[in-house]
Amino acid sequence: MKKILIVDDEPNIVMSLEYTFKKKNFEVYIARDGSEALQIAKEKIPDLVLLDIMMPNVDGYETLKEIKNDKSLEHTKVVFLSAKNKATDIEKGLKLGADKYLTKPFSVKKLVAEINELLN
């Protein structure tokens, strides 16, 4: 069973994504901000982190940097899922090492397809 860590501070998005990925037989972990995400990631070693950018405490960019600097997480894929949809935001996310950058609002079907493609 693949492990996914959903990192977002919007409860409705978290609930929707959690439901979707559990239905698709993922083991799902939830974090509300970057610092909580890093704690969970180091403990659970997820196959993929679905990461928002604009969050309290530690933002998505900083969280991604920390994930990329952690040897135990070197095989973990990271997908940004953000409302920040300017070309400069997307470029920054990919330059920092995100495997994909998807924007909100999003199609659940497309999101699941993108994640399955990354993990298979």
Regions found by a protein language model. Name each.
Residues 55:
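Receiver (REC) domain active-site loop signature in two-component systems and cognate sites
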